[in-house]
Swiss-Prot record:
Result when mutating F113R: Does not interact with unc-64. Does not rescue the uncoordinated locomotion defect of the unc-18 e81 mutant
Descriptive protein name: Acetylcholine regulator unc-18
Cystine pairings recorded for this chain: none
Keywords: Cell membrane, Cell projection, Cytoplasm, Membrane, Phosphoprotein, Protein transport, Transport
GO MF entry, a single one: syntaxin binding
Species: Caenorhabditis elegans
Length: 591
């Protein structure tokens, strides 16, 4: 089962289904969720599945709700002071619901547990459990902690006021990812950024607590080989800056997709309708195409459309015009409207991406690839990077953000430049001194940016030759994470730069003491049957994971069975989001 399937299975089987009461009006329950639980639910379960299990309405804990005193309420919430206060208020003056079944997404602190136990709401609570899913399964191998403040707290030394509580929180969330997957992994971290070891120890403590509550966690074939690697964003600042030409990364970079919703116009010549489509794994064509290079996506979608059309008895030839506008085909085959609309979406995605590519992204890609790899398309070493860059820096048609991306790539390729040279570059590129901070703030990530004196050498794994992988001239850069993952699987990852936490290199027959406080709240016996055998590599990047890095994990998983690579972060980032994070890094921020 994939990460998404495991979470969906747990939500239905451990939270919703046990409280279903049969048929009739009294059988219905209300489901109350906080923001994270709503995202988790939306990611894994369809509304009709939830309703089939007796849920009549899903409500937001933080919004005003109408009383439904004849119905029982299921609360799926994080055990925070705010959430518990809202829960208590529901049973104060008048009861909003008949009784409460409370499921915390993670471990509840003693203090909050005591507050709830002593409240007036306590006598209405019929169920109180921890399900240990404090993350959103974004894709089958990707998780999101949805913690946008982490980047600012972790990388800016002046904002450490909220850092301790944030690290505690994300450590708990990371531990719930491992617990959900049934893993008790060895723990490694990137040593070149000092704070990583602190987070590593916090995660270790949380994992040990989960292991104490469920000794079967991490048992099974090859599970002793599973690893969790904690990495800071400074390990590879090049990947978040590049224009990537595989479909998913390109769409999110260029097409302004928000909350995974793609908007486009469709229809015949007389009418234009705006459509909204959710890009997720429920669309099998999206899953098939998302990691493919844009050069082949259009051809493959067209080929698949033609094959589908002919398999349904439509033998007419399809010229380019009818592919561009599928409305006539939909009229001829109305019973297949749903499938044809999928093709329409993907043709539109590919066309929009290609249009942007041809309108200037192609020139950016060439220079970006030369800067990032240090080698040009002919395999020659790049000798004058400035000469490549300047025509784009002075071109008014190139967006300010794209010029910033180029300058940062140039600086990283040089391992830092002088302040004088940076100011000259900014002047060339017509970039304001206010935007200069976007560049200089990258130093907070441990990168050499402005270096008037000595430069520290940054270690990266040796780049591999990849003779069997198809390489496009405009996509020669391979995300550093791919080399790290492959080296970790092959037991070749440098232990000086990626050390194991003491005592966590090999898990052999570990048996933690039973939890005195929680007993066996955390897991029901027999749950392990849902977990896959074989080792997992779990990657956590502090400060955002890119779509290119997500793709690398799927590629390695496909090539290195029985290993499965799962990757996650506090948020999913695009190049523009990465620049915004850098720009705001030293600004006052309410946490």
């Amino acid at each position: 089962m994939s990460l998404k399937q495991i979470v969906g299975h747990k939500l239905l089987n451990d939270v919703i289904r046990p409280l279903k009461k049969g048929d009739g009006r009294s059988a219905w329950n209300v489901l109350i969720v906080d923001t994270l639980a709503m995202r988790m639910l939306s990611s894994c379960c369809k509304m009709h599945n939830i309703m089939e299990e007796g849920i009549t309405i899903v409500e937001d804990l933080n919004k005003r709700r109408e009383p439904l005193p004849t119905l029982e309420a299921i609360y799926l919430i994080a055990p925070t002071a705010e959430s518990i206060d809202k829960l208590i208020q529901d049973y104060c003056a008048r009861n909003l619901y008949k009784c409460a079944h409370v499921f915390f997404t993670e471990a509840c602190s003693d203090q909050l547990f005591s507050t709830l136990s002593k409240s007036a709401a306590a006598r209405f609570i019929k169920t109180l459990k921890e399900i240990n899913i404090a993350f959103t399964p974004y894709e089958s191998q990707v998780f999101n902690l949805d913690s946008p403040d982490t980047f600012f707290l972790y990388y800016n030394a002046q904002k450490q006021g909220g850092l301790t509580s944030n690290l505690e929180r994300i450590a708990e969330q990371i531990a719930t990812v491992c617990a959900t997957l049934g893993e008790y992994p060895s723990l490694r971290y990137r040593a070149d950024f000092e704070r990583n070891v602190e987070l590593g120890h916090l995660v270790e403590q949380k994992l040990d607590a989960y292991k104490a509550d469920d000794p079967s966690m991490g048992e099974g074939a090859d599970k002793a080989r599973s690893q969790l690697i904690i990495i800071d964003r400074g390990y590879d600042a090049i990947t978040p800056l590049l224009h990537e030409l595989t479909l998913q990364a390109m769409c999110y970079d260029l097409l302004g997709i928000e909350n995974d919703v793609y908007k486009y116009e469709t229809g015949g010549s007389d009418e234009n309708l705006e459509k909204e489509v959710l890009l997720d794994e429920n669309d099998d064509l999206w899953v098939e195409m998302r990691h493919k290079h844009i050069a082949v996506v259009s051809q493959e979608v067209t080929k698949n459309l033609k094959k589908f059309s002919e398999s349904k008895g439509n033998k007419g030839t399809m010229d380019s015009k009818s592919i561009k506008d599928l409305s006539m085909l939909i009229k001829r085959m109305p019973q297949h409207k749903k499938e044809l609309n999928k093709f329409s979406t993907h043709i539109s995605l590919a066309e929009e991406c290609m249009k942007q590519y041809q309108q200037g992204v192609d020139k950016l890609c060439k220079v970006e690839q030369d800067l990032s790899t240090g080698i040009d398309a002919e395999g020659e070493r790049v000798r004058d990077a400035m000469k490549l860059m300047v025509p784009l820096l002075i071109d008014p048609a190139v967006r300010c953000e794209d010029r910033l991306r180029l300058i940062l790539l140039y600086i990283l390729s040089k391992n830092g430049i002088t302040d004088e040279n940076l100011n000259k570059l900014l002047q060339h590129a017509n970039i304001s001194m206010a935007d200069k901070e976007t560049i200089t703030n990258a130093a907070y990530l441990g990168l050499n940016i402005v270096t008037d004196t000595g430069r520290k050498k940054t270690w990266t794994p040796t780049k591999k030759e990849r003779p069997h992988e198809q390489v496009y001239q405009s996509s020669r850069w391979v995300p550093v994470i791919k080399d790290i993952i492959e080296d970790a699987i092959d037991e070749r990852l440098d232990t000086k730069h990626f050390p194991f936490l003491a005592g966590r290199q090999v898990n052999q027959g570990y048996r933690a003491p039973a939890s005195a406080r929680y007993g066996q709240w955390h897991k029901e016996r027999g749950q392990q049957s849902n977990y896959r055998s074989g080792p997992r590599l779990i990657i956590y990047i502090i400060g955002g994971v890119t779509f290119s890095e997500m793709r690398a994990c799927y590629e390695v998983t496909a090539a290195r069975k029985p290993w499965e690579v799962v990757i996650g972060s506090d948020r999913i980032i695009t190049p523009d989001k990465f620049l915004t994070n850098l720009r705001d890094l030293n600004k006052p921020r309410d946490i």
